[in-house]
Amino acid sequence: SQFAPLVRELRSEGFRVIAFDAPAHGSSSGRSTDIRDWIDAAEQLQAEHGPFVVIVGHSFGALAALTAARSTVPVPAVAVIAGAAAPDAFLAQFGADLHLDAATNARLSERFRRRLHMDQSAVTARYDAVKRPLPADTALLVVHDRGDRRMPDHDSLRLHDAHGARSRLVRTEGQGHTRVLSADATLDAVIALAASPHVR
């Protein structure tokens, strides 16, 4: 698992860690998923193993972590690693990766909204953590590599700015989108967040 170094570090510091492969990811079954499945998984884990003190999410999982923490899985802190504040950032990057034109990108966004049975205002209200930030008593850690090509850092910077003094920003160099998970700076920052008096 890409989270293995972080899990080891947290456990060595005495934390109990619940890690899972999201639906249709890693060793989990399924061929397709959307953000609702990730949030359902977080809710089930919270009910069985919670309450949690920190939720850590990477990439799309970071958006799911933010959404869960803002709605049905309240926690004292969230760590967002190589993530984004809203679905639009992922849709835009997917379109850029495939060199989609504006009309095709618009159809992709519309299909996403139809799948969720929501219009744009409902998607924003439910999933945009800049326009609808975390609760005021929830701390935020944002970690992003400056050279991340799979999910550039501009949306993470918006997320950090939207949360003011309760957000800590850690920017790495040369780690990219995946290796950032095991970077020393990331591990140290997540441990510090989990051990902070606000959280414990």
Where are the language model's segments positioned?
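Hydrolase active-site cap/lid region
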Residues: T72-D119
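Alpha/beta-hydrolase active-site loop
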Residues: G30-V53
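Gly/Ala-rich beta-loop-alpha elbow adjacent to hydrolase catalytic centers
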Residues: V56-A65
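Catalytic histidine-centered segment of alpha/beta-hydrolase-like enzymes
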Residues: Q175-A185
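Active-site nucleophile elbow and catalytic-triad environment of alpha/beta-hydrolase enzymes
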Residues: R114-P133
